[in-house]
């Protein structure tokens, strides 16, 4: 079965949202060490947007139990252009970004071209403290929307 997914990383919070074709969702968070994540994705094909260049690297470290702070360091390296070398991850994934034209549009541009709402989060990715409950809910909703658009 295919699972669509997206990851968000903040200095004190990191999580991944999965959805199946019927939009059933599952959230894994660093606060519980991503407990159950490996078992949940076992045998599934993961589908993301630009995941070959970002999410797959982060997900591999989530599976190793990295903390939000460690994931944020990796996140910043990747965003800064220092992408880790790809290796054989313990999961199978497909990247919908690879099916897009060479202009390399971002997911938000594609959403706009499809006439979809462009949802942004007001929670800054460099938030210098743990998220408040309402910020966490907003960030998860933002992540889940990106999974839907993938």
Label for each model-derived stretch:
Residues 1-20:
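Gly/Thr-rich phosphate-binding beta-strand-loop-beta motif of the actin/hexokinase/Hsp70
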Residues 8, 35, 39, 73, ...:
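Glutamate identity and glutamate-enriched acidic tracts
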Residues 2, 20-109:
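Conserved DEDDh/DEDDy metal-dependent 3′-5′ exonuclease domain
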Residues 47, 101, 106-150:
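Acidic, Mg2+-coordinating catalytic module of metal-dependent nucleases/exonucleases
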Residues 6, 95, 146:
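Acidic active-site catalytic centers that drive phospho-/nucleotidyl reactions
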């Amino acid at each position: 079965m295919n699972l669509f997914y997206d990851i968000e990383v903040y200095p004190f919070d990191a999580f991944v949202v999965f959805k199946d074709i019927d939009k059933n969702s599952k959230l894994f968070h660093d606060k519980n060490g991503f407990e159950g994540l490996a078992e949940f994705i076992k045998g599934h094909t993961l589908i993301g947007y630009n995941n070959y260049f970002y999410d797959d690297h982060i997900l591999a470290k989530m599976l190793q139990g990295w903390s939000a702070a460690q994931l944020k360091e990796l996140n910043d390296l990747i965003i800064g252009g220092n992408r880790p070398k790809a290796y054989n991850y313990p999961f199978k994934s497909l990247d919908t970004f690879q099916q897009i034209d060479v202009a390399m549009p971002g997911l938000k541009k594609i959403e706009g071209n499809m006439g979809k709402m462009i949802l942004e989060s007001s929670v800054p990715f460099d938030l210098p403290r743990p998220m408040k409950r309402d910020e966490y809910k907003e960030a998860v909703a933002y992540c889940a929307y990106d999974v839907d658009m993938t």
